[in-house]
Amino acid sequence: MYAIGKVYIYCIKLYAQGVCIMVQFISRRKADFGKAALFVALYACINICLVSLLKEGLYLHGLKGILSGGVIFALAGHFWNYRKRFLAIYAGMMLFLSAGLIIKLIDHVAVGGGEFLGNISLASTIWGSILLVWLCIENAAALTGKIKAGRIISSAWLFISLAILAVPNLVLWGYFALSQHYLRPDIVMTIYQTNKDEAIAYLMSQNPFYIGLAVAAFLLISVLIFKAAYTVCVTDRPSFASTPHGWLGILPMIVLLALGLKTTYAAKEYEPAHIVLSVRDSVKSYTMFAQNKEKRIQRLNALGTLPVLPGHKGIYVLVIGESETRNHMSAYGYQRETTPWLTQFAKEPGTLLFKNPYSNHTHTVPVLTYALSEKNQYNQVPLAKAYSLIEIANAAGFDTYWISNQERYGAWDTPVAEIASTAKHQVWLNGEVGTNIKTAYLDEELPIKTPDLKNVDNALVVFHLMGEHTTYADRYPAVYQKFDEAGTKRDEYDNAVLYTDFVLSRIYDLVKDNPHFQGLVYFSDHGEEPDLGKGHESTKFTNQMSRIPFVVHFSDSYRSANPALFETLKGQENDYWTNDLVYNFMTEIMGIQFLPINEPNLTLGNPAYDRTKDNIRTLHGERKIES
């Protein structure tokens, strides 16, 4: 304790000496102090003017953060004598370190005043602090005679700190060069969940010019950053002071200024930090969902078997499509005949072709995590505590099947894999764990590989297709290459849609004659934009990416037993709906009672359903639907 006390007292003395040096500096060099104050004021005015222009009105919030960043800037500027080249490089580094903010503005993404000032002030503080710490190391080495060691340490500090800060901002600029859009956290999450072959397929689908542009931008900016650091720290190397304690006193002052900034702006205001923290929270949420599986099952077991309404027990088939947009389906009015079977199927008395279904996101994992659980865009249920459709079906006494042509990626798509893992019967055509999207089987193998259902009288059977997943040409056999007018991605996509239509017919044929068959439901996880080559990236969002098919067919026996429910659904065929409400819909038509939560206003088939074009959302609540 005595030693700690001595260190503590020494630190206080050190800081006091630093303050004394600064006071002496102010009293003896009033001209320099006046110049520094002028630069702080100028810095603050520029920031206030910029954010006021952005907000279209005088914006005076966050002044403490602005001043903290300004003081760091002025302090660094003093030691470099406010040289024009230093100021130009300082401004350039601030712009670079504010990459996320600038790209958002270019991409017309809404930016708040606090977010704007937070990024600018943090960028100034980061760059200024790097320089001042480097200067302290160099000066301490000069005063102690440890020139060589000091040079190594200061160079390591400069290189490591710049590399750590440069990489995320370079990624932001690189992605912008590739896609002309801002990098959203969900894109990073998708990359985290993407395997090697899927990444290669994505790159191959991009314009080679933009790939080259992204690589060139990455290399050029990297060179410019380290050139700027070399210019500031070597070419324009400042002279050193002769008072060690004064120099070391700068360090706690930097810390205090940084703390002052932190009390004004949270770290998540800085765009790279915001992305990292958002991804971390998503991963944590998905991990907790997996870890809480046993707890959810125990809670359901404590409730006993969930009752099912009379006339509802039987076999239900849920088919999950992949990347299919209804804009390319002739059943929904597309000019090419891509869905001949579905077009005829829609005319049958038991079939409902919903006209306004939308996806809740444009990426598979977030879509299905919501679609197959209690969690949706409109409630506050924590994902970790949300029961899945499979868990509820098990608790209601249904036999559950998960039959997939997508590989069980394990770590890459934990929530979907966890939901599937609770099914009593699982068939993974491409194995339990995989690292590519080059499936060994086409989707038509799914009904062939399905366990025999002849002696099954009460079940939920889920099929997960590869559908129109990129690369489109890999999703169908040569015999389905019907559209090849120009050899475009559109032709390949339409061929894949045509093949999916055939697969749906085969799945229906598998169950239609089973006396216990009750209904078949088909929806796609999200849409696709093959016409513009944008795929389904949320940063490149178009309405077509969210426009999905939603088709339901009920057997004669189901309609006879539940005429009111069927008529209600028929009357809702034109209603707006998002596929995060699949859980609600399936539990409704399966007649499962005493659910952990009831949301009649979010449940198709319930007369209280109240979703409209004005109140449905996509991208997990971020975006309104535009039909």
Language model features: what each stretch is:
Residues 303-306, 535-540, 570-571:
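Short, P/G- and charge-enriched loop/turn segments at secondary-structure junctions
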Residues 504, 525, 550, 582, ...:
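Hydrophobic, well-ordered secondary-structure elements that form the walls
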Residues 96-100, 337, 513-517, 523-563, ...:
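Histidine-centered active-site microenvironments of extracellular/periplasmic hydrolases
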Residues 93, 104-127, 164, 173-175, ...:
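Membrane-proximal envelope and lipid/glycan-remodeling enzymes
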Residues 249-319, 323-481, 578-579, 584-610, ...:
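Active-site-proximal alpha/beta segments of enzymes that process anionic O-linked groups
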Residues 2-272:
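Transmembrane and membrane-interface helices of multi-pass
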Residues 304, 447-452, 483-520, 552, ...:
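A long, amphipathic alpha-helix that forms part
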Residues 380-387, 486-498, 540-546, 559-586, ...:
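A short beta-strand-to-alpha-helix junction
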